[in-house]
Amino acid sequence: MCSRVWFITDRRISQEYPQIQILRALKERCVEDDVEFRYLLMDEIVLTITDGQLGLRVGQEIVTSYPQVAVVRVPTPWVQSDSDITVLRHLEKMGCRLVNRPQAILNCVNKFWTFQELAGHGVPLPDTYSYGGHDNFRKMIDEAEPLGYPVVVKNARGHRGKAVFLARDKHHLSDLCHLIRHEAPYLFQEYVKESHGRDVRVVLVGGRVIGSMLRCSTDGRMQSNCSLGGVGMMCPLSEQGKQLAVQVCNILGMDVCGIDLLQKNDGSFVVCEANANVGFIAFDQACGMDVAGIVADFVLSLLPSRLSRKMSLLSVVSSTSETSSEPEVCIPTEVIIPSEVCIPNEICPLGTTCPIPDAMSTMSTSSTSSESEADLTETGPTPVGANPAYNINSLLASEMKLLTE
């Protein structure tokens, strides 16, 4: 049976960095492994049910060869269950393994839905309130008082750090009520003061942490999104942080995701957000990684032919280990931190001094802490902080030391 992989994305984000890089990597891997590949935009697909059987058309073409695995990149804040999710459900019902699955995407479309899924699993979360009804923001001004002030206010479908506010007091909340748009509900969330202006973005592929990046605001604002002028730096993550990110990923059922963590003074973490359509332009640059290539390798590993091969290899290894008397030897691989992502003129976590005079000044902006890293056209030079004495290199060094203690 011929192996087939599809890449499906939304026309609105098809020309952005993550989609372009995943398309490149998938094409390369499929050519190397003799896998049939097809690239489609969501609005090109026509769903059919004929003679009681599910089918697909692309334009006037009746599709007869379906993929075993399909990578999906949709702008999660704008996902519509009556259109986008319907297409993905159709493919899933036809036996296609989706990365990510429809339910995993839905779990991250709305920030409160994400917390609903995580609640009850022992995941540390900031106390959060929301509301039903179309426009009950004003009523929540009184209802959310137990959270204290200042309080974080977020649009449930916000993205890229937008529609996020820090309300100083009740009067400030009343002012916000007149300014915000009410298409989606808002969250009222406990303010984690210790993590103001910084968070840790953890990227996972196939349920495994592939890297982590410390993000810091450069202008004193609460959000640390690189798309808003924040800067990112590769940083090692404690075992507790890794385990928490993996736990969140598994609960939400995601294959590829970004988990944003806030850190308290005692070194513990709380979950800020989860991103099913994680962007990785700044992550690639900060960590010296090719996330798209890692995603492509994972996707091809899901093909039935690969899974069968893995089972055969496991069988051989198992029988060999039972008959062999030789002890297994694990050879540790050398950990290399690229010099271009080290902290300039400071001490790296591994104890070496970085020679680069100002690596952080070359960092590009990344997308969002929230769902999708849409609209890379907004990326630009990092704004200069309001305080001229603000030293981002010193801040990053101290934060990385805190994270690894």
UniProtKB/Swiss-Prot annotation:
PROSITE patterns for the chain: ATP_GRASP (PS50975)
Keywords: ATP-binding, Cytoplasm, Ligase, Magnesium, Manganese, Metal-binding, Nucleotide-binding
Keyword set includes Manganese: yes
UniProt feature, compositional bias: Low complexity: 360-371
SUPFAM superfamilies (UniProt xref): Glutathione synthetase ATP-binding domain-like
Note in the entry: N-acetyl-L-aspartyl-L-glutamate (NAAG) is the most abundant dipeptide present in vertebrate central nervous system (CNS). Beta-citryl-L-glutamate, a structural analog of NAAG, is present in testis and immature brain.
Protein name as catalogued: Beta-citrylglutamate synthase B
Originating species: Danio rerio
